Amino acid sequence: MLKTDVLIIGGGLAGLSAAKALEGRKSYIVAERESRPGGLASTVSKGGFRFDYSGHLLHLRWPKTSKFILDALGPNRLRLRRDARVYAHSRWTPFPFQANLSGMPDKVKAECVSGFLKAWNAGGGRGDGTEPFSRWTRRVFGDGISRHFMLPYNAKLWRYPLGRLTTEWCAPFVPMPSPEEVVEGAYGRRTEGMGYNTCFYYPKRGGIGALSNALAMGSSGLRLGLEVESVDLKKGVAQVRHFGPVYFKRLINTSPLNDFVAMSADAPAAVRRAAASLRHNTVYVLNLGARGARRDLHWAYFPGPEFPFYRAGIASNFSAALAPRGCSSFYVEFATAGEALDLASAEKAAVKGLAACGMLDRASQVTERLWLKIPCAYVVYNRERAAALPVINGWLKARRAQSIGRYGAWKYSFMEESVKEGLEAAGRLLRA
């Protein structure tokens, strides 16, 4: 039996950051079920390559969290300027598609520009987040950009009906150009610096797991291989597999919100119904190690139906230390609505697709492969989510518990935001 002031479920970036802020000020236990810290912000080694769970890049916006993250990395960091592209109609064009149409065929370019200008002149603004995505993108970007990129790409990514997907998530992640930028990006020079991720940081060595390892250093309460099976917030006790009870005064959850409610013994029926309505997709990441295959881009988006994956990147362009000398490493992302992916067929399609777009010369270059599965990858924004979260969060507040991070708060966010929420959650406990 253990007793602690604070139980933190999950040793990802949110949980590790909360622990760092609590260190020496309150007793805490971070229960991380895996044998390494970081959750999805971890790195796996195989055959001399280091593979992440897809592209995990540090886009820093806030001074306090930026300093916290950069101090943790110390000199083990690189600052890079984004080189992201879109491959559509057998051509490359810079990302974001809507502001960089110059690479597209003339007919596609004209459709996209004229459609955008019509939509812009019709007015209406970005909306309040409740509008269905399929209607919103046509209203905001016009028929051309929607048909050639927004609709096919997002259908591949979310694996959820776009007529039911709401748009609350769009503001930080979908850049909105002006008419001048759209025209200039189609017929003039490339539009630079648009979007939230134009510059990013990445560890020089160790993959993104280097950040998690740095945050875990000196964490007296981190317990790896500790899986929480059930929680009773009213009684302040958690049952841990192969260990027994852990008693706590306050709790911070960073595990998927629906899973947390399901294992909470004291969750009322209304809260359970709300959690059961939450939806997410599943992402399978194929990591490839290859001889040679030097290309200068960081990652690319693939809206076309000829590519079953939605995005692919060259991780060794984030840091050369991710691959042996003379080699490159790739990641290719496939999404499903939760069903299993045929890995053998998907791998063949990935290699064929990378060769078709020129990222890879030939299949024989591939020397290493590793599949990584993200069971809960992107949480779905729909009307059910909007109705469920107030119910669940109201119960958590009454129990003086916090659920934070990308999955604990059930939202689409980036790594710095998880760190920020961890620090803020700890701050609230220290002030209580």
Predicted region positions:
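C-terminal segments that line or cap access tunnels to active or ligand-binding sites in enzymes
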Residues: 248-250, 258-402, 413, 420
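A conserved FAD-binding loop/helix module that cradles the flavin
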Residues: 406-430
